[in-house]
UniProtKB/Swiss-Prot annotation:
Residues 212-224 have a biased composition (Basic and acidic residues). This is Ermin. Keywords: Actin-binding, Cytoplasm, Cytoskeleton, Phosphoprotein. Residues 1-12, 21-30, 225-234 have a biased composition (Polar residues). Plays a role in cytoskeletal rearrangements during the late wrapping and/or compaction phases of myelinogenesis as well as in maintenance and stability of myelin sheath in the adult. May play an important role in late-stage oligodendroglia maturation, myelin/Ranvier node formation during CNS development, and in the maintenance and plasticity of related structures in the mature CNS. The keyword Phosphoprotein applies. Its main location: cytoplasm. Gene3D superfamilies: 6.10.360.10. Residues 1-71, 212-246 are annotated as: Disordered. GO terms for molecular function: actin filament binding.
Length: 282
């Protein structure tokens, strides 16, 4: 047997109209018989209308299968897009802040726009009067500050000059006291030096006088005829001349010793004592 497909509309299937041209019922049936023709069955073939639905289901399944592995890529793209959007937002915020600051700078430099509005004559007069009052007040303050500074400078200068004078007077007094003390010390030292010199000279003269008779006796013994029989006794004139020469020598020797002692006294005490003793033993 051969099957003949028959297509029916929805109304015909529902029984609204009877079938035309003696066609069979709405559903396609196929009657098959076995070789024994004991069993019959009806098979419904799929119509063409159901085929696109299956194809669409297969395509949708394929599309779902294709979408599943792309999830990670989509997430990456979304993350990148969010980062780009955040960067754009930050950039826009920075631009707005820069614009605001530039606008504030221009307003600060050029002044507010309401200040640039031309004023009436009455308003101008009032503003000028206010400005004059302010300028006068400022000038008065400046004058007062200048006068105050001048008085301070004068007072400070007077104080400084008085302090300087006091310091100078103190220094002069200290110098005078110092000079007086030095002069007194010098006078005392000179007096002590002179007293010591006089004492030394007196002692030296005493020693020299005590030693001079011994020297004269020794000289007389040498000049006596007993010691030198061939020698002749000197005349009194010669003895006077010898006595004068001896006095001159004594005076010069004592003077030399006093001068040298004064020179020696300026050095060390031990050194000058040793030198003086050595001079005494000459």
């Amino acid at each position: 047997m051969t099957d003949t497909p028959v297509t029916l509309s929805g109304s015909e299937c529902n029984g609204d109209r009877p079938p035309e041209n003696g066609q069979q019922p709405s559903s396609q049936t196929r009657k098959t018989t076995d070789a024994d023709e004991t069993q019959t069955y009806y098979g419904v073939e799929p119509s063409l209308q159901h085929l696109p639905a299956k194809e669409n289901q297969e395509e949708s399944g394929n599309s779902k299968g294709n979408v599943l592995p792309r999830g990670s890529e989509d997430e990456k793209i979304l993350n990148e897009n969010t980062e780009e959007n955040l960067f754009v937002v930050h950039q826009a915020i920075q631009d707005l802040s820069l614009q605001e600051t530039s606008a504030e700078d221009t307003v600060f430099q050029e002044g507010h726009p309401w200040k640039k509005i031309p004023l009436n004559s009455h308003n101008l007069d009032m503003s000028r009067q206010k400005e004059r009052i302010v300028h006068q007040h400022l000038e008065q303050r400046e004058d007062e500050s200048a006068a105050h500074q001048a008085t301070e400078i004068e007072w400070l200068g007077f104080q400084k000059s008085s302090q300087v004078d006091i310091l100078h007077s103190k220094c002069d007094e200290e110098e005078e006291v110092w000079n007086e003390e030095i002069n007194e010390e010098d006078v005392d030292e000179c007096a002590e030096d002179e007293g010591e010199d006089e004492v030394r000279v007196i002692e030296f003269k005493r020693k020299y006088r005590e030693g001079s008779p011994l020297k004269e006796e020794s000289l007389a013994r040498e000049d006596s005829p007993l010691s030198s029989p061939s020698s002749q006794p000197g005349t009194p004139d010669e003895q006077l001349v010898l006595g004068k020469k001896g006095d001159i020598a004594r005076n010069s020797y004592s003077r030399y010793n006093t001068i040298s002692y004064r020179k020696i006294r300026k050095g060390n005490t031990k050194q000058r004592i040793d030198e003086f003793e050595s001079m005494m033993h000459l």
